[in-house]
Structure formats: structure tokens, C-alpha cells
Regions:
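Short cysteine clusters
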Residues: 175
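Short terminal hydrophobic/aromatic SLiMs and anchors at protein ends
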Residues: 39, 43, 62-63
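Substrate/cofactor-recognition hotspot
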Residues: 178
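Cys-dependent protein tyrosine phosphatase-like superfamily
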Residues: 2-10, 14, 18-29, 33, ...
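Intrinsic, low-complexity polybasic segments
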Residues: 31, 36, 40, 47-48
């Protein structure tokens, strides 16, 4: 049984603890996949399909593993990133939320949610009416993990966090799987509000994610965010450095802030089921 992560430890020690916990999670996932998919050995497949080169066989095997992963509905469960017992502030990250997970967040007092995959209309806006009417969805936009977040989004996120800290609110953000877009934003939060360095933030992002090698641009993006936090010029170019854009093109209000409540503008007929 894993011990809960101690919040009183320095950030470096907490990161090391999280990496060990993430490795346990990886091993559990590998065992689950091994039980869900039975793959024949390469030699057997090569005999049946002698025309297939080795890389095709590897791709077939990988595709089978991915199919098993999707079938298991694998997404990161809600995880507390930071909290302040004195004020009541808390921040959670997650993958796509089930009804039970959303209900648990509500029970813990989460008041506002930022959705990074643009899927709130078909999920949270529907589920909130059933079990958690007090939670507000402040942002709902499909960010692209292959492109850097904008300066306007970061400014809106900073304002959201600072208001939440000042008022002692509990906040959460999610993407679809909880590894890439949510991982990048967590890295930014840790550097901006917890004093972590880029290397430390990247280590935790990688430790808590799966299929991170498929998104090699995330590490240099986080390094660029670290330069921004440190007040240094971004040296990575437009591919990784946050750029200034029209706020509305990033799902923000024209004033460059998060909306009051995305779901308030959705009727039953507008909800995608």
C-alpha cells in the first residue's frame, strides 16, 4: 500500500516521492495491459506473415497495446497539485472526469473547473445539472499540446489562481487524459507559484504521464515557460515560446479573462450527448 504524499516535504523531496509513485502506477498499468491483451511472439507472427518487416510487426503490437489502453478508459484520476490549509485554497489536476470523480471533487469543495480539451459541453455541463450545480466551468477550449500556450491564456490562468488563493477557493483543471496538456500546465504552475525550476517541473511532468515520448515538444515548451517565469527572453523560437494572440481565438473572453460560467450558456438541446 502506498503512503500518501506528504505536503510538508520540500518540493524536491515531494517530486522524488511522486516519481516513485508514478513508477508503481506504470507497473500496475503494464500488468493490466498484459492481462487485457495477448500478443503472439514475433517469431510466430513472422511465420504467418513473412512479408511483414520488423517495424510493421512492432507497430501492430503497439497498436494492440494502445487499443487495450483506450478500452480500459485510462485517464489520470484527480490529483491535488497544491493546497493551503490556512486559507482553504487547493488546486487539482485530472484527466477526463467520470461522474463519480466529478462528484468527489464537488464533495471536496471544488468550485471552479478549467477544461483544456474543449469537451465540457458534452460532459461537465451535463453532469453538473445532475449532481454538482454549484461548480462553474470557467474555460472550455481544445488546446493543442504540440503548440505553446499563449501569453493571454497564461495571464488569465495567473489571474484565476491568484484570485483563488486570495479567496481560499478550490480549483481544478483537466484535459482528456490528464498527462500532456494538464501536465504542461502543472509544470507552469509549479514554476510560477511553487518556486520549482524547469528541470524539476519537467521531471514530474514526465513521471506522471504516459506516452510522453510522442510529445517531445513538451519539454522545450516547459523550458520556455521557465524562462518566462524567470523574466528571461525566450530563446526557443515561436515553436515553443508563448505568443500573443487574439484572446477569443484561445477560448477567452474579449477582455482576456476566463468566462464566468461556460455551462450557463448551454441548454439541454445544446449539450452534445
Amino acid at each position: 500500500m502506498r503512503l500518501p504524499l506528504r505536503k510538508d516535504l520540500p518540493l524536491t523531496l515531494r517530486t522524488e516521492s511522486k516519481i516513485r509513485m508514478a513508477e508503481q502506477d506504470r507497473q500496475m498499468l503494464e500488468r493490466a495491459l498484459a492481462g487485457a491483451v495477448s500478443l503472439p511472439p514475433k517469431a510466430t507472427r513472422a511465420g504467418r506473415h513473412p512479408q511483414r518487416p520488423g517495424w510493421v510487426q512492432d507497430w501492430v503490437q503497439l497498436t494492440g497495446l494502445l487499443a487495450a489502453l483506450v478500452s480500459l478508459g485510462c485517464a489520470a484520476a484527480p490529483h491535488r497539485v497544491d493546497s493551503d490549509a490556512a486559507t482553504g485554497f487547493a488546486l487539482y489536476r485530472s484527466g477526463q472526469l467520470s461522474r463519480a470523480e466529478l462528484a468527489r471533487l464537488c464533495d471536496e469543495g471544488v468550485e471552479e473547473l478549467v477544461v483544456l480539451d474543449g469537451g465540457a459541453a458534452g460532459r461537465e455541463c451535463e453532469m453538473l445539472r445532475e449532481s454538482c450545480s454549484n461548480l462553474r466551468v470557467r474555460y472550455n477550449f481544445a488546446q493543442n499540446e504540440k503548440h505553446p500556450v499563449s501569453q493571454e491564456f497564461l495571464a488569465a490562468f495567473d489571474q484565476w489562481i491568484e484570485e483563488g488563493q486570495a479567496e481560499g477557493r478550490k480549483l481544478a483543471y483537466r484535459c482528456r487524459r490528464g498527462w500532456h496538456r494538464a501536465g504542461r500546465l502543472t509544470a507552469y504552475y509549479q514554476m510560477r507559484f511553487m518556486g520549482a525550476g524547469a528541470e524539476e517541473a519537467i521531471d514530474e511532468m514526465q513521471a506522471r504521464g504516459l506516452f510522453m515520448a510522442w510529445f517531445p515538444q513538451l519539454n522545450p515548451q516547459v523550458e520556455a515557460l521557465g524562462q518566462l517565469v524567470a523574466g528571461e527572453p525566450c530563446t526557443g523560437g515561436v515553436e515553443v515560446c508563448p505568443q500573443s494572440v487574439d484572446p477569443t481565438s484561445e477560448g477567452l473572453d474579449p477582455t482576456g479573462t476566463f468566462s464566468a460560467n461556460i455551462c450557463a450558456g448551454h441548454s439541454d438541446s445544446e449539450v452534445v450527448r
